[in-house]
Amino acid sequence: MLSFKSLLQNPVIKKSLSLFSTDVLVRGANFLLIPVFLHLMTKNDFGVYGYLYNFAMTCSLILNLGYHSALPKLYIETSENRKDNASMLFTLSISLFGFLAFMFALFYITDADYAFFNIVNNSEDVQFDYRSYRPYLFIALASMIFSNFLTYYFISAKKIKNIQAFNLIRMFVCNIAVITVLYLSKDTDKVLLRLSITYVTEFLLCCVFARSFIKEIWCKYRKDYMLRALKIGLPLSFVGLVNSVVNFGDKQFIMLYCGSEAMGAYNLASLLATIPLIVFQSFNFVWLPNFLGEKNLQTLKKKNDRNAKIILSVLLLLSIFIWFGSYLLLQWNIFPRNYGEITSYLPMLLLSQVFAALILYYFNYFTYFEKTHIPMVISVCGAFAGYLLYSLSAEKFGAIGISTSIAVINIAITLLYIIFSNHYIDKRIKATA
């Protein structure tokens, strides 16, 4: 068994700790600011903002063409040839942002987004003016895709300091601006203020940090890189679309059957439940390039199995602390007491996010073997199950029923990922023996 000292000397662990320390500061500060926003916004406003934020985040996972998987893979393959690497970066960025501009124009011409939001607005317990939020929701979507593209570029290029600087500056500038304006505003729509200030500021910061990326590109479009990226990424975009039934469907059913005030509490619980997933992502950001670059399959499997056990144990323990801490914060009125309902369904949401982390972890195998169509098939099955469970549980059991449903779905998907990933690596090991 490895000693604690030898673990700390491992280069992957050391880089993880370096990135994790910044993430702890950034994410920790964002979570510490949750009570500030809870007191600056009404429960209804907090619910509407959370709903719009999750809608934009879900759309970003659908419209990003799966670059978060294609970019690290192609970067490693082209890293030894600077011109190939530079043209690959240019090809992926032009393809992604050209596609995004086309989709934005299409939505503005057809008004398809209005048809979606009218479903929620027909509910008696939900009322908000989507028309006023629309321009800033599109900016938020563009900013999310832009910032994640930069993040995965920095990860692929192993520019850890760039990630740290970007995250720290974004945290300070965006939060200071938003909190100041919300505090000074009295009768203004606080959902609109928070949405607009946060993502206009973030988008401008992305433009500043994109300078280091622009310096690396070579303006030569390569069709072969575009096709490779689409082969890897398009199944993931489809997975994002299908997964939206599970990952955004819970918020949609909460808004439809419980209203925007209940969505405020559910949004708070969902934010707290993402902590285990965020902790995992700090590790995965550093682990992924090393995972994709490992040539010895037996070593890869051994490391992967060991890390999976550690991740599961750490995240379950962390979840217990989060639930207990949330209970204390409610008792001390740091979280307003009208959010007390979260203690009943937060455990299930935490469990669902622990297994969501494992889903992402085992997804690395499908990227490694370029078998990203497998998660696509699994996601379709999960979406059908999710819609069925939400439909049966939402009206009768509310948030408790929905949170239990999403936990069951994520556990089932994790088990399928483990089965298929082990099948492929065992098959490849036998073929190379």
Question: Where are the language model's segments positioned?
Answer:
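Interhelical loop/hinge segments that connect adjacent transmembrane helices in multipass membrane
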Residues: 1-13, 118-129, 161, 188-195, ...
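Signature of the first transmembrane helix
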Residues: 11-68, 72, 101, 108, ...
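Interfacial segments at transmembrane-helix termini and the short loops linking adjacent helices
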Residues: 12-13, 112-137, 260, 324-357, ...
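Membrane-water interface segments that mark the loop-to-transmembrane alpha-helix transition
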Residues: 14-26, 52, 61-117, 128-135, ...
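Transmembrane helical elements of multi-pass membrane transporters/channels
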Residues: 15-34, 167-174, 191-210, 223-289, ...
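Hydrophobic alpha-helical transmembrane segments
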Residues: 51, 135, 164-213, 381-385, ...
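Helix-loop junctions and terminal segments of transmembrane helices
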Residues: 63-80, 273-298, 367-368
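Membrane-interface junctions at transmembrane-helix termini in multi-pass inner-membrane proteins
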Residues: 74, 143-165, 293, 351-378
